Amino acid sequence: MNRNLPIGPAALEILPQWVRKEESVASKLPYVSLVDDHTIRTKGNEFFQCIRVSGLNSLTVADEMLDRMKDIFASVIAQTGDKFSYTVHKVSRRIDTSLPPVAGDSFAAQIDRRWQGYMQRENLREHTITITVIKRPDVLSKIPFSLKKSRELLASQVNAQVVQLHEVVEFLRTALSNMEPRVLTASSGELLGFLESINTGIEVPTFHSTLDRTVAEAVSNTRVTFKGDKIYLTGGSLPDRVGMIYSIKEYPRESFVTMFDELDLPVDMVVSNYFTPINNSLMEERLSRELRRREAINDKAQNLVNALVEAQNRLASGEVTFGHHQMAVAIYADSEDELAKISSQIRNIAVTAGVKMVTQGYTARTVYFSQHPCNRAYRIREGAITNEQFADMAALHRAAMGKPGGNVPWGTPITWFPTITRSAYRFNFHEEGDPAKEPTNGHTLILGRMGSGKSVQAAFLAAQAQRVGARVFVFDYRRGMEMAVRALGGKYSELRAGERTGLNPLWVETDTAGQEWLSDWLIHLMESGHGQLQPEQSRAVRAAVRQNAEARNLNLRTWTEFAQLVAATPDGGALADRMNEWTDGHRFGWIFGREREDNFSLDGQFVGFDLTDILDSENNKARMAVLSYIFRRIERKIEDKKPTVIIIDEAWKALDNDYFAARIENWLVTARKQNTVVVMMTQFAHQLNASAHGRTLLQALPSKMMLPNKEASVSDYDGLGLNEKELEILMGVNPGSRVALLRADDGSHVIDTDLSALGKLLTILGGMKAGEALVGADYRTRPDFWKGFDDA
């Protein structure tokens, strides 16, 4: 069958004789014209519109929700009656995972090149879901003899049909509103592109460019040849391929909503389901006739008789409606060998669903064309099923792909991850938002047991965030990210208990905002472990802060000098005693008291500091003092609103104190407004949940990456609101699995976080002993230590 090439008389003379006899693909398609940008008219005077939906991820969405959405879809079908038919098409198409590259020849750029190359080679697929609503033709009124009046009558009838169609489409869109339904348009190329994909298994934008061509001709852009049970697609703008088509021969006795979810194979595929309602009165008569027939022959298959009685009762009570159904599965491959491998998988999936699905031989051409909306005349195997069974078999299930760059504050996804269904997911820290407006919340939680790869994932995301030039600060624990920070061109230091820190807030916080913060912070510091200050003591602290800021001699901005400023407070020396704890030579003097100038630098694209000694300290006061001041320094740094990522390992240790409990929510809001993402890592959710501000924290971290833990218990995930499926993913996977559960504002997703495609770059990202064994223990003295491993 040819591609509808317009052939002139001279061309016919030099072409083979068989060309004259070859039928066109368009002649078998029903599409005539575009009524408007959304609506197509057919040869049979039917009208239809197509709705694209995002679907539900059946791997993670609770079964109750899947059943509820199935019931909603089935209910719409029942309510719209027998004047409307429905098709559901799932078309597999290859995903373009390219992203703007990380510029340069840095470690981050090498990681990006390696990862993007891997993602492109994986042949990952998305499966679009398109619901076609078909307005079946009404009985026409008598046509007047007058040409003018007949035209007016026909025009009004067409308009009435389109209005009814539009009402049902809007009704369905409202019912499926949580699936982001949108009507496909011809002007975008999507409407005709979808119809063409039913022929080819590949969806590309297609337009109706000339008025003298039918829509059928516009979407027929390949040559189709049927040989035995094979379908050969040749010519046109798409590569030549070979395909097969299957249809249901025997239906299952029962259906369930996930029965065909495994038909999401990574190949060019079209899965079509067609449902044409049967008038209830006619169906009741058919059921009654079948029951009478079975009674007449004294049928012993009582289960079947009972099923017929139940169907008759449910139909009479309006619980269900029946319709003619056909399901077809068309698959395409580059070679017949590849096609044979896919075919066996199709059969296995059908057997698992309790369905007998057969390949089509000489009938392949009829099933092939019957896939198209409004092409019922080509159907050869129709079954009578209920609207509920149709909603099961055509379930609107699909793994989401994440938010595109235009829908997130940083203008591009951070990276792509494969999913376990061989699709792909765009990872973004942020919730959906306009890049031109105030940033949405991008704070993220990474959960995983020790050794599960939390730090590696955080380092990978930090490297990929260089796509947007993000600045990165790392609050590290046990040097887990040291090698990654250094490889990424960053500075790394260590704060050790009892040793000089380089920190001195008295030197830095001298402007108006700084004085206000410093006063509040010092008062809390003085009260910690000692009780609340008296009003005159608080006033003395504020006065001393002001004097410190106004001092012309900068050498006076030390803790020893500050203690002398509050010594005159008429409180019997109580405030001075509290202050002296922090001066050199006293209990906490090592933290701030040994410094004159603050030389703790946060300059650079990557800055990491190991806080193991601080985090492991049993002294909550010292931990709070160090961390709160570093947070403050970063808070001042991010005022420039440059994209920034702050990574905090063992976050529950870092933030579990009264000071942060009172301020963490506002601090996270401030960070968000300053274009900053905070990534917190911990082993278990209950560690955060049990802290003084745990519930606030969990609510403030909308994105959550959870790595599997077979040894975890349900209580370890308290506060996250996980359903049974999500818990099974986290607690039931095999040891060593790199599957992760990702929760974001667009749902819950199962992604594959296996980064082994990075080769030795992954070992460097992970650091520790394995990293040192690869690059050498002296890597800290060699800024380019990672080079030479990028092509390994």
Regions of interest found by a model, annotated:
Residues 1-403:
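Extended, folded cores of ATP/NTP-driven motor/assembly subunits in large transport
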Residues 63-79, 258-264, 355-356, 366-425, ...:
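P-loop NTPase motor domains
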Residues 451:
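Walker A (P-loop) phosphate-binding loop of P-loop NTPases
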Residues 457:
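Hydrophobic positions on the alpha1 helix immediately C-terminal to the Walker A/P-loop
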Residues 495-497, 703-712:
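Conserved AAA+ ATPase "SRH/arginine-finger" region at the nucleotide-binding site
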Residues 693-706:
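A short helix-turn-beta junction within AAA+ P-loop NTPase domains corresponding to the substrate/partner-engaging
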